[in-house]
């Protein structure tokens, strides 16, 4: 089964996944960074995590959300740079920030990148790989958990993606 087919199946089955696990984000972030360390090492990228927070949701889906964001950050970052992920609680929300040192996302595309198959630049997809579903999946997972994702900052020196999740379960979650 191709990577694209697997991702499409994941997206179609999201609503059936129970979302009531208590999740400590620091250990999950460390697991994601460990799993992506070989990819980062190929480019000489340092992975850094800071902070901790707790949320309620699907540990499988939150892992996928974090994995996709960090994997994108590694792919688009310059060699020998740093990818940083921060987690913190702010009131009744959890804020997750993934910062890379890549080419940035032009302002006119900062909402379009969450649409399935959208590409800022076709040459980027050839250079960096992927099928254009990773950020769409992240958007769906965040929304399913009562949260959101946005480009918080972006310039030619890198991008910071911000995911906001509730710290407690929503009545609509399974």
What do the predicted segments below correspond to?
Residues 100:
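Acidic ATP/Mg2+-coordinating residue in the GHKL
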Residues 21-34:
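A conserved beta-strand-to-alpha-helix junction within the catalytic ATP-binding
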